[in-house]
Amino acid sequence: ISGNAANAVGEKIRKIAKKHQVIAVTHQAILTAKANHNFMVKKVTDNLTTKTVVKNLTEEEIINEIARISGGSITKTAIEHAKELRKTA
């Protein structure tokens, strides 16, 4: 989903989250922007093991992640767009 549909889903999740805990896994910038808390879940492997690492993101890290998932590269323009998404979410 994207655009208006993603925004509508984000609003529904926000409404549900007022009374219930919601955990959503997403690659949608708008959903990330609307979240109260963001976590990065990452798979880390070496030659012997695979681990899952979960990190609670700071506001700056959230902005960078929104920029990354919006366009793939963290550019000045992508950062400004991410800040605007976060501000208006």
Regions found by a protein language model. Give the residues of each.
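C-terminal lobe/lid and adjacent interdomain/linker elements of RecA-like ASCE P-loop ATPase modules
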Residues: 4-89
